[in-house]
Amino acid sequence: MANLERTFIAIKPDGVQRGLVGEIIKRFEQKGFRLVAMKFLRASEEHLKQHYTDLKDRPFFPGLVKYMNSGPVVAMVWEGLNVVKTGRLMLGETNPADSKPGTIRGDFCIQVGRNIIHGSDSVKSAEKEISLWFKPEELVDYKSCAHDWVYE
């Protein structure tokens, strides 16, 4: 199948604390994407610094790491046709004020510093992020019974 890919999605501490985990998972499942891995954890500062290494020179970096370390996160890997691009569209803009209603951030967020969810921005970054958060044996390969109803 063309463009079958995987993406990394993380529900941030504010999304967990606000009880939005089920709603977010529901949206990805209803779209037709397949969950292949999931963890509930409190990421260490060191792990978060690795994850956000491309932002290390930005003035908001220390606050971002502190915020992400402030509580548990739900780390997930989703698979599907064009899941990276479509997943980003489902999330909405990084700044919730620029997000359209119907997107996760458009429906549930107000400020950029509390935007409840992270999603890989490219296939390359998805591969990097997935390998940072999950071991290969933690990625479960299976065929969903809904597969033939979602894909031609």
Curated annotation (Swiss-Prot):
Pfam families: NDK. One of its GO terms (biological process) is positive regulation of DNA-templated transcription. One of its GO terms (molecular function) is GDP binding. It comes from the Eukaryota. It comes from Pongo abelii. Belongs to the NDK family. Its main location: cytoplasm. Hexamer of two different chains: A and B (A6, A5B, A4B2, A3B3, A2B4, AB5, B6). Interacts with CAPN8. Interacts with AKAP13. Interacts with ITGB1BP1 (via C-terminal domain region). Interacts with BCL2L10. Its EC number is 2.7.4.6, 2.7.13.3. Keywords: ATP-binding, Cell projection, Cytoplasm, DNA-binding, Kinase, Magnesium, Metal-binding, Nucleotide metabolism, Nucleotide-binding, Nucleus, Transcription, Transcription regulation, Transferase. This is Nucleoside diphosphate kinase B. ATP binds at residues 12, 60, 88, 94, 105, 115. Residues 1-66 are annotated as: Interaction with AKAP13. The active site is at 118 (pros-phosphohistidine intermediate).
